C-alpha cells in the first residue's frame, strides 16, 4: 500500500482503472533503461520521472550544444557544454527528488549493453542511428526485455513497441494472458534488415521540428507506463506507427516476422538448442 503522501502525489493516475494503486506501486519499483538523451530521451524521461518510475538509467556520451535547445526541452542555457546525462539527471531530480538516477556517459560495448538490458524492466531506444538500434534490439531479444523504439526526422516520426516476453518480476505479478505478447514476435531487424550499414539522414542536414520529436518521446513514455503499471502494452505491439506532422495524421503498418532474419531466427534456434540440451 502507498502512504498518504505518495497516494496524493500520484492520485490522478491512480484514479485510472488500468493503473490503480497496484499499478502505481509497480511504477515506483520499476527499473527503466533510456539509451539516448536527446529530444526523445528528454521527453520520455521527464514524463516517466513525473509518473513515479523508481529507477532510471541514462546512457549518452554527448554534451549539450546550443542547437539542441530547439527540441531537447529538459536542457537550459546553463547546460551548454555539460554532459547530457548529467544535465538530464539534474532536471529529473528537480522534478522528482525520490527518483534514483544512474548515468553512463559513454557508449556501451556489447557486454555492458547486455548487462544493463538484463537489469532493466524495459528499454527505451532514443538513439539516432541504425547500428546502435540494431545492437539494442539484439540485446533486448537476448534478455527478453521489452523494447520501445522511436525516431523523428523533418516533420515525420515513427514509434514501435516490441514485447519479447519479459522474465521480469513486474510482469510476473500481472495476468500473463496478454494478447499483445507473441511467442515468437518480429524484431527491429525484421523491420529494417538493411539498416546496419545504411547511410542515415541526420537532423542537422534534413532538419526536424521539435514538437514531433517530443510527441514520439511522449508515445514512448505512454507505452512504458502501460507496460510497467499493467504488465502489458495496451497498444498493439509489433506495429509501426507513422506520424506526419504536416498533415497531423497517423498510419499503422503491421510488422511481419522475417523467416530469414539473422537476429531473431538465430536467437530462436539457440533457445531451442538450449532447451533440448537440458
Task: List each model region and its residues.
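Adenine nucleotide-associated cytosolic modules
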Residues: 1-278
Amino acid at each position: 500500500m502507498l502512504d498518504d503522501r505518495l497516494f496524493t502525489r500520484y492520485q490522478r493516475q491512480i484514479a485510472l482503472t488500468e493503473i490503480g494503486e497496484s499499478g502505481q506501486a509497480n511504477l515506483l519499483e520499476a527499473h527503466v533503461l533510456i539509451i539516448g538523451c536527446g529530444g526523445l530521451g528528454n521527453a520520455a524521461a521527464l514524463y516517466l520521472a513525473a509518473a513515479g518510475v523508481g529507477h532510471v538509467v541514462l546512457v549518452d556520451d554527448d554534451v549539450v550544444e546550443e542547437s539542441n535547445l530547439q527540441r531537447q526541452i529538459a536542457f537550459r542555457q546553463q547546460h551548454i557544454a555539460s554532459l547530457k546525462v548529467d544535465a538530464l539527471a539534474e532536471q529529473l531530480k528537480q522534478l522528482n527528488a525520490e527518483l534514483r538516477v544512474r548515468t553512463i556517459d559513454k557508449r556501451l560495448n556489447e557486454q555492458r549493453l547486455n548487462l544493463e538490458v538484463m537489469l532493466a524492466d524495459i528499454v527505451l531506444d532514443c538513439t539516432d542511428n541504425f547500428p546502435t538500434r540494431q545492437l539494442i534490439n539484439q540485446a533486448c531479444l537476448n534478455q527478453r526485455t521489452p523494447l520501445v523504439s522511436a525516431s523523428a526526422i523533418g516533420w515525420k516520426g515513427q514509434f514501435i513497441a516490441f514485447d519479447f516476453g519479459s522474465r521480469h518480476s513486474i510482469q510476473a505479478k500481472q495476468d500473463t494472458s496478454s494478447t499483445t505478447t507473441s511467442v515468437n514476435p518480429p524484431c527491429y531487424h525484421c523491420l529494417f534488415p538493411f539498416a546496419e550499414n545504411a547511410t542515415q539522414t541526420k537532423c542537422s542536414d534534413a532538419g526536424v521540428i521539435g514538437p514531433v520529436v517530443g510527441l514520439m518521446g511522449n508515445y514512448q513514455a505512454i507505452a512504458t507506463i502501460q507496460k510497467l503499471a499493467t504488465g502489458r502494452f495496451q497498444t498493439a505491439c509489433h506495429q509501426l506507427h507513422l506520424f506526419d506532422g504536416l498533415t497531423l495524421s497517423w498510419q499503422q503498418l503491421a510488422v511481419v516476422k522475417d523467416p530469414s532474419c539473422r537476429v531473431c531466427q538465430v536467437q530462436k534456434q539457440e533457445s531451442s538448442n538450449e532447451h533440448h540440451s537440458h
